[in-house]
Design a protein with these regions (language model features):
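Cys-dependent protein tyrosine phosphatase-like superfamily
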Residues: 1-218, 231-322
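Long, low-complexity serine/threonine/glycine- and acidic-rich segments characteristic of extracellular
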Residues: 350-369, 373-379
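Exposed aromatic-hydrophobic patches
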Residues: 65-71, 333, 360-366
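Ser/Thr-glycine-rich phosphate-binding loops at phosphate-binding pockets of nucleotides
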Residues: 224, 228-229
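Surface-exposed loops/turns
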Residues: 74-75, 326, 368
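Solvent-exposed, low-complexity, repeat-rich "mucin-like" stalks and linkers
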Residues: 78, 317-343
Length: 386
């Protein structure tokens, strides 16, 4: 139960709740029952996000007819059909549609507590953080084989960002991810709460990982998935414009770590107070001030926003740096994603000539320098510096 809507109202009852459930997360999967005629040899349920039933998840319902489905995206339309095999003949039902309720996407991962998708939270401009990109959780050291299969399969985790110190990590996992040897393991110890805002213990290094599209999907965690993990989530959510009230609710969703129980009454309060004191009129502006303070560039911040909030173009990793002109020109390697074209490029507010070919954008800057902006056909933008 999440009830902390301001700094004077936090969910102190979660300690009793956690004790009551026996230190384990509770998940409510979607349950679908299939009523079959006769006695089919095999019953399968197919579930897809696509109306044409492409790329479905397939569940075996033989003998019981009931399927519990974990890890569905929230606020999302799904399509399903049943497939039967009887007397060697395969038949299938018509396609049905159902929609999941809106809200946080909490996922049951074997051996891992407090696992949830950071997507689905509403943000400024009527947008939402995209699901399936960033996950937060507690320690992954004890992940089960089933948990690994979910993380590498359906969720497709590419990067494991560990926010703990070396002493907190099981020795066998100090250089590789418990998920898989194929997952990029990055350990960046960070400070929780207010210290994070001033660059303590790797704040900038942790945030920079989210600027590279090749790192996604990313899972980040500390020990309990609360204090350090909650601080990093707070910054990312503030940056993309999630309402402060929803950020507080997300922080309180960790069932065994209410603010008052872990760091006293002032840890989270100091984070919020320090954040509010940053320069800027909006949460996004304040987050930009802090992210610049800890070493992020405008190009990196542009990428983070476009990755999390749009399907628009982003800079490729090799172009995420200050550009030095050669013969009066600078070039950027772009992943265009769903953007189709560039409509304008400006430098210090003035339009400049450009050319786009095979994802390489060449901009004529002459002897000029400063802040530039690339605008795409879908009205998205990227910021660069010369």
């Amino acid at each position: 139960k999440a009830e902390m809507y301001d700094l004077n109202d936090f969910a102190s009852n979660t300690v009793d709740y956690y004790s009551f459930i026996g230190s384990s997360d509770l998940h409510t999967p979607a349950r679908i029952r299939i009523n079959s005629v006769g006695n089919p040899e095999k019953i399968e349920l197919l579930v897809s996000e696509n109306k044409d039933m492409s790329d479905p998840r397939v569940f075996d319902a033989t003998g019981h007819g009931t399927v519990n489905i974990n890890a569905l995206k929230t606020g999302t339309a799904y399509y399903c059909m049943a497939r039967f095999t009887a007397d060697g003949e395969e038949k299938q039902t018509e396609t049905y549609e159902f929609r999941t309720l809106d809200g946080p996407r909490v996922i049951a991962v074997g051996g891992v507590g407090n696992f949830r998708d950071m997507g689905s939270w509403p943000a400024d401009g009527g947008k939402r953080i995209k699901q399936g990109l960033i996950y937060r959780c507690a320690s992954i050291d004890n992940v089960t084989d089933d948990g690994r299969q979910l993380l590498t399969g359906l969720l497709g985790i590419k990067t494991d960002l560990d926010l703990r110190t070396e002493a907190e990590v099981a020795e066998e996992y100090r250089t590789r991810s418990p998920i898989s040897a194929d997952v990029n393991y990055v350990r960046v110890p960070i400070a929780a709460y207010r210290s994070f805002l001033y660059g303590g213990d790797g704040s900038g290094k942790a945030l920079k990982l989210f600027a590279d599209l090749d790192n996604y999907p990313i899972v980040f965690h500390c020990a309990a998935g609360a204090d350090r993990t909650g601080t990093l989530a707070f910054m990312l959510e503030s940056f993309v414009g999630v309402d402060e009230r929803n950020i507080f609710i997300d922080y309180e969703l960790t069932p065994n770590r209410p603010r008052s129980y872990t760091v006293g009454d002032d840890g989270f309060e100091q984070l919020v107070t320090g954040f509010r004191a940053a320069q800027g009129n909006t949460s996004h502006d304040k987050a930009v001030t802090i992210m610049r303070r800890v070493g992020l560039t405008d190009m990196e911040m542009s990428n983070i926003y476009n990755i999390l909030m749009t399907d628009s173009a982003v800079f490729k990793s090799q172009s995420l740096s200050h550009q030095t002109p050669s013969d009066g020109k600078v070039s950027f390697e772009l992943n265009m994603r769903k953007s189709k074209s560039v409509t304008s490029v400006t430098l210090e507010g003035k339009k400049v000539a450009y050319g786009l070919k095979n994802g390489t954008l060449t901009v004529t800057v002459g002897n000029s320098a400063g802040r530039g902006e690339i605008t795409f056909d879908d009205l998205s933008t990227l910021t660069f510096k010369v």
